[in-house]
């Protein structure tokens, strides 16, 4: 059962949907997370059904805040106009409305990389950092969040800049999923990532990069 000093967080990705109660004072899981594979046909109805299952699993009370990190640009009150890593039927949908109706309660939906960036500033490697922070997440795609003096610049989607001679965008050239699909060794993948981060350095000259996402589990490599 979730407690009053906690919220319930959901991270929707192209390969998995992860959820857990979160301790708002520590910025950490209050209970072990529950991961359910993203449906092969990841329509709004199919994904929202899984989020409701996760809420029920943790017996989340009506009073608990629910936040959902979603892999697309999110503009409050507007319908989705872009989708890279879930079913294209999401385009034209009010994402917040879909999840609120499925869960039977208000929810807050934000871009997944923006959520990661705000967490880094509040609890992680970027805490207390002045100037420009570029938080990146490496997983099915490449997510980015720009935070300047603690203020989020939302929905940057810099994982879609053109990076290769074949006119591939960055996440189709250097994401963690591409490393797995092309069976790249870590040294070869690191060269691709170096190209990406070098371009970001040239364009934005940030004071700090952070790297997170699914790749965090293999950080020593």
At which residue positions do the language-model features occur?
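Short coil/turn motifs at secondary-structure junctions
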Residues: 24-26, 73
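Glycine-rich phosphate-binding loops at beta-strand->alpha-helix junctions
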Residues: 16, 200, 204-221
